[in-house]
Amino acid sequence: MASLRKTHPLLSIVNNALVDLPAPSNISVWWNFGSLLGLCLITQLITGLFLAMHYTSDISMAFSSVVHICRDVNFGWLIRSIHANGASFFFICIYMHIARGLYYGSYLYKETWNVGVVLLLLVMATAFVGYVLPWGQMSFWGATVITNLLSAVPYIGNALVQWIWGGFSVDNATLTRFFAFHFLLPFVIAAATMIHLLFLHETGSNNPAGLNSDADKISFHPYFSYKDLLGFIILLMALTSLALFSPNLLGDPDNFTPANPLVTPPHIKPEWYFLFAYAILRSIPNKLGGVLALLFSILVLMLVPILHTSKQRGLTFRPLTQLLFWALVADVLVLTWIGGMPVEHPFVIIGQVASALYFLLFLVLSPAASWLENKTLEWS
């Protein structure tokens, strides 16, 4: 008689996704980040739910309610600390996951990849509206600066900004709707994740060799379930260590000051995980141009499958494109550094060069290098 997990209408879905799923035998630790992202999402949902029970989305009480959570709620300080730092770990895992996809050519599963890019945009939107909720100085001014960018939209720009604000400035209506969005979006992310997995399981996983692995598959459980468990333990240990030992390491000191519309902080900057995009935005002197560059810095990922010119899938046996990949990694790190620096010489020119290189690597240099490698190997 067949096992219940194989015959039950609901359990069979779980079984086919987590137990009897055929997986390539040679997938490395870089394939762990998908499940780590699932863990991050669950952690954020649980801690966020408990925070929402005690948070008040009113400009006169928001900052005080966060203080109340940290001082008066049982383990409130820990829940908040895990939630705030969990966001950083979420983005570390996302960027690693995307880097893996770029390196090994996983983007050739176009549906999975495009849903992934949509997921990235959703997570970024969620993180942005979440950062506004404590209603500190950087929350308020970050919301003001970033929402103001929409005024660059031709003709309807100003109306659009006032519509999002719910008034003529970032005020109570803005905070209330941002809280609503911050509560709603993670559930949309969870649904999109299911679609992401659905498309992935249509094709099966890619592997480091970039070759068809149908001839050499092993079951997900116990092999990769235990491998993922190791990743879970490492991630949770790192997260709790950061949350317990230096919870404010990645935050901005300005956010310990309640929001004041009359005092502008000396340097308005987002959390570290948005700095690369913020640097690209600032490197273009024109407002609309900057906004388009900001948007395209993420949407360029959707062009990667279209611009894939190589006869090989991954970069495992392509030294020239490997060099460009690591140049891209270095470039993003430089942009992250520049995003946190004041707008003055030499940071402006470094940011402009790094921004130009970012788009060149995606749109020109990588496809050209792939074409050259094909020619060298006489595969064209």
From Swiss-Prot:
It comes from the Eukaryota. A ubiquinone binds at H201. InterPro entries: Cyt_b/b6_C (IPR005798), Cyt_b/b6_C_sf (IPR036150), Cyt_b/b6_N (IPR005797), Cytb/b6-like_sf (IPR027387), Cytochrome_b (IPR030689), Cytochrome_b_C_euk/bac (IPR048260), Cytochrome_b_N_euk/bac (IPR048259), Di-haem_cyt_TM (IPR016174). It is a multi-pass membrane protein. Its main location: mitochondrion. Keywords: Electron transport, Heme, Iron, Membrane, Metal-binding, Mitochondrion, Mitochondrion inner membrane, Respiratory chain, Transmembrane, Transmembrane helix, Transport, Ubiquinone. One of its GO terms (biological process) is mitochondrial electron transport, ubiquinol to cytochrome c. Heme b b562 binds at H83, H182. The chain crosses the membrane at residues 33-53, 77-98, 113-133, 178-198, 226-246, 288-308, 320-340, 347-367. The cytochrome bc1 complex contains 3 respiratory subunits (MT-CYB, CYC1 and UQCRFS1), 2 core proteins (UQCRC1 and UQCRC2) and probably 6 low-molecular weight proteins. Heme 1 (or BL or b562) is low-potential and absorbs at about 562 nm, and heme 2 (or BH or b566) is high-potential and absorbs at about 566 nm. Component of the ubiquinol-cytochrome c reductase complex (complex III or cytochrome b-c1 complex) that is part of the mitochondrial respiratory chain. The b-c1 complex mediates electron transfer from ubiquinol to cytochrome c. Contributes to the generation of a proton gradient across the mitochondrial membrane that is then used for ATP synthesis. This is Cytochrome b. The lineage of its organism: Eukaryota, Metazoa, Chordata, Craniata, Vertebrata.
